[in-house]
UniProtKB/Swiss-Prot annotation:
This is Small ribosomal subunit protein uS5. GO terms for molecular function: rRNA binding; structural constituent of ribosome. One of its GO terms (cellular component) is cytosolic small ribosomal subunit. Belongs to the universal ribosomal protein uS5 family. With S4 and S12 plays an important role in translational accuracy; many suppressors of streptomycin-dependent mutants of protein S12 are found in this protein, some but not all of which decrease translational accuracy (ram, ribosomal ambiguity mutations). The N-terminal domain interacts with the head of the 30S subunit; the C-terminal domain interacts with the body and contacts protein S4. The interaction surface between S4 and S5 is involved in control of translational fidelity. Changing residue 26 to I: In BSPC 111; spectinomycin resistant. Altered S5 proteins have been identified in a number of mutants. Some mutations in S5 have been shown to increase translational error frequencies. It comes from the Bacteria. It comes from Bacillus subtilis (strain 168). The keyword Secreted does not apply. Part of the 30S ribosomal subunit. Contacts proteins S4 and S8. Residues 11-74 form the S5 DRBM domain. Changing residue 28 to V: In rpsE1; spectinomycin restistant, not a ram mutant.
Amino acid sequence: MRRIDPSKLELEERLVTVNRVAKVVKGGRRFRFAALVVVGDKNGHVGFGTGKAQEVPEAIRKAVEDAKKNLIEVPMVGTTIPHEIIGRFGAGNILLKPASEGTGVIAGGPVRAVLELAGVADILSKSLGSNTPINMIRATLQGLSELKRAEDVAKLRGKSVEELLG
């Protein structure tokens, strides 16, 4: 899989969660902030990143930097995805279904952020299993990265799209 250069894209970022995490030491607890950010250009490119620091803005900056390193390309057919797929990561499963134009993004929380920043305008999604934000995002991105257009599958099989679709 080739790496996507973030400097050539106009990326928009969206903060999904900020968590206060603690490290318990002899003298008490040491608090830090963990941020989860999704970035995308609303045109088929999306990624997520995590960052941890003692201050919230610094954690967010680190998360954005990380997200730009983890961009994936999302194949689209018009305003939706080419086919139904279940993205799996850990205990989090996300069902992604293509929808007709005008349906909108039917998704909850973190999944909505990923799909909107990827540029998918019409889609149905359902969270199955764990709904921990990071697992939902990872499952969604795993599902989106496995999508294939009919043209790509036809090319791999050495057939025309008409032959493939019957």
